[in-house]
Amino acid sequence: MIDEFNGITYLVIFIIHFAGYAFYAFRCVLSTKAFVDQYGMGDGAAIITRFFGGIFVGSVLMALNIMFIRSEGLEGSWAFFNLIFLQNLCVFLVSLFANRQGSLGTNEKTSIEGYIAPGVLTLLSALLCYGLADKIYWNLILCK
């Protein structure tokens, strides 16, 4: 498995990235009340919180599929990794943009986690796209 990920470094980055996704999936879907209370969002935010948690669940399941089940492993999985990177980047940029737009959604419980977590996830997913390029873009290289 280590060779599949071009060494231990990218395997660890993959595990850390999707462990973060699994953490937020759990918090949003199964621990919704504690999550919305932690950030002072109120019970009305539960539905949309679970909606976004569901997106994390799907990504974690796909990552587990690529890691353990898919016969090709990482080969040709460029669309998944690029989608993950773009989602992370968009969440990071939107959080920065929203911060500049004013105080909507901020309260005494708001933390910088809303900026830091997407930034870290964006960096990790960019590293995965770069470090695994020879594997994930394999089918695209053969088509040329």
What is the meaning of each model-derived region?
Residues L127-K144:
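Juxtamembrane boundary at the C-terminal end of a transmembrane helix
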